Amino acid sequence: MENLPLHVFEKILLKLDPKSLAMMKCTRRSINSHISEDPYFKSNYLSLVGFGLLHNSYYGSKSLFCNPFGDSMPFRYTYSLDIKTRFLCSCSGLLLLFMDYLCVANPLTKRYRFLDHSKSIFLGRNKSGIQSCLHERYNVFESRPNHVYQFEITTGDSCWKLSETTITCSPSVPLADKKPVYFDGCIHWLRKDGSILAFNPETEQARLIPIKFPLELSAVANKFLFEATEKELALISATEESINVYSLEDILIDPKWVLVKEIQNGVLHKKTMRCWNVAAYNGKCLVLWQMNKVACDGDVFGYDLRANKWEVIGWIPEWCDGYQVFYLFKPSFSSAIELKQKVDVETMNMVHGDDCKYISTLRKLMSLIEEISPYAKRLFKKKGKRLMTEEETKLKMTVDEPSSSKCLDVMRFSKKRRFLGMEKINKRKRTVRSAGRSGVVEGFLLYVVTAQYCRNTGEKLPISMVFYGSVFDNMHLLP
């Protein structure tokens, strides 16, 4: 393989599905370096990986539903998780979960890490405080003036930092059912008065974007969704007849919502429909869901903005509640960098108690998401090949450090080496890189807790949680 020209070798790598590419990284340090650090290869490969849709109950459940976009494969789900699990965020191929504890996991690389929130000012007080944060029960502050926001950040197991930044806003609160979104280096919260609270975790600067909802949204009792695409912040306004897509323009000078797309809503079954809402949007696909009256089950519809057509992409069984939370998920292998610890799953399964249940739950979650990788399905379908069974693909992925006899010289980080005929530096870069227009930061992961309190009473309560980034050191391996 060393004799192959670089462009030929990259063509081979680009044809691999994400799981196979992650395995390829384990074969050789130079290949790992090329896949993980070359910005051109990463950009080309990630552009081929499609989005999938994940959802479970807003209050957490033992079931998970997921489906790839643009694939005819039936909607997949599992209902046998050992621990009640709730999805909080999804970013850069990572999932933030809550299963009695906070957990960051990458389904593709089978890496995970539990976060210790006991030293958090906002989350470490008591169990009820955590639940209040997770359920976003902060409407108690809705009518109080002089609201002040604070931010708490963690970059490790027990390293929590209370930012010195505070911001005072008008008496309004973030919408409880609208998730914060990450775009262009900042986390954004949509508030009830239409304004947007933005916080940059890197510079720890916060500001309020003074903007109102579009007039059409204010005048009609409709559904709406606040999302971030690769290029912009978007607001989706939907009625039973039509759906409007707005883009936020001139965010720094004169922010305003501009109508960019109008879609006819012709998929809802009004006679049998009990409730419905907008689920997700990524600039390429729009997702709606509805729950039915008689059968008590539900349907998930997807609209392809490029093909301008609707199709059924999933369903919601009758035993699910009507409070389903949807997340767009894109597999990524980038979090496999610098991860040294691993867990022997077979040994853990023989251990009785709650620890085994957590590991078992993670295994089931990762296995289900891995099986429906959008990129892998599209590749196999194109080549007319059948999908490999679990027994055929079962392979332990270890990223252990080589023995001392095989280690490179300790000065390897300052030396150049030849890789496929090209000079490359085999240094694990820790500099922060921007991953495209979306502003997702690679190289570290931050977990941000936002709190709000009233100056008059001094009462304080965490209101939301979000994380971003793609690399978290010392995560565990789940083979």
Swiss-Prot record:
InterPro entries referenced in this protein's UniProt entry, alphabetically: F-box-like_dom_sf, F-box_dom, Gal_Oxase/kelch_b-propeller, SCF_F-box_component
Segments forming domain F-box: 1-44
Descriptive protein name: Putative F-box protein At1g20800
Source organism of this protein record: Arabidopsis thaliana (Mouse-ear cress)
Lineage summary: Eukaryota, Viridiplantae, Streptophyta, Embryophyta, Tracheophyta
